[in-house]
Amino acid sequence: DEAADALISAGLRAAFPDLVLITEEQAASHAQRASTFLIVDPLDGTKEFVQRRGDFTVNIAYVEHGVPLRGVVYAPAQDRLFYTLPDGTSVEETGAFDHDIVGTLHPLSVSKPDNTALRVVASKSHRDAATDDYIGKYAVADMKSAGSSLKFCLLATGEADLYPRLGRTMEWDTAAGDAVLRGAGGCMVRFDDHSVLTYGKDGWDNPFFIAYAPGVQLQK
């Protein structure tokens, strides 16, 4: 975590010296407040990494007035790279991931969900009875488990329709994946009142949330 954080932070500070940088690994950064900032999780899915599973990610996001406008989610063990373009749309890049050569870009678009046969993705390491009870309110045709912010990317690629999270997360866990999801036409709302999730909150804690493709009939 710390080695990756040092490398990423140095690069971001050099490229964007005027932007506030919030990173999970630098506790001193958590006291900062700004309407526009960068937010980083250098290793999302620590349990997956320690257990040598492939679904851990690097998350980098740019947030403006509470909205994650740009995001990068990189899953190095899976050779998958997702990010938003300047126009706000999201893509998955494939290829050699060369610094100087952009690979093939595949535009991302969420699914058109069938509420009689939904595809649900949930946390691999933090799934609990409350989550299962909530998922039970839907007609589920397929259930996936995944770690880290890859769950947002599965929604963004159209591989899943719904991702509920009834557990603690921090803004650096979700901002990049949220940006990628929004850029693919998806939504992320609070669990309690279905209002849009915002960023830059005191303490950097997220409420419970639901990420989904428009058309999913959300349950209470």
Where are the language model's segments positioned?
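Acidic donor-binding loop at a coil-to-helix junction in glycosyltransferase catalytic cores
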Residues: W172
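A short, glycine/Asx- and small/polar-enriched loop/turn
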Residues: Q32-T36, A156-E159, G203-N206
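Hydrophobic residues within well-ordered alpha-helices
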Residues: L12, V120, L154-A156, A175-R182
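Glycine-rich active-site/cofactor-binding loop and its immediate structural neighborhood
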Residues: A34-V73
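Catalytic beta-strand/loop signature of glycosyltransferases that borders the donor
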Residues: L166, V189-D193
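Alpha-to-beta junction loops
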Residues: T157-L162, G185-C187
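Acidic beta-strand-loop-alpha-helix segment within the catalytic core
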Residues: I60-F152, G200-K220
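N-terminal subdomain of lithium-sensitive/metallo-dependent phosphomonoesterases centered on the IMPase/IPPase/PAP
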Residues: D1-L43, A129-K137, C153, D193-S195, ...
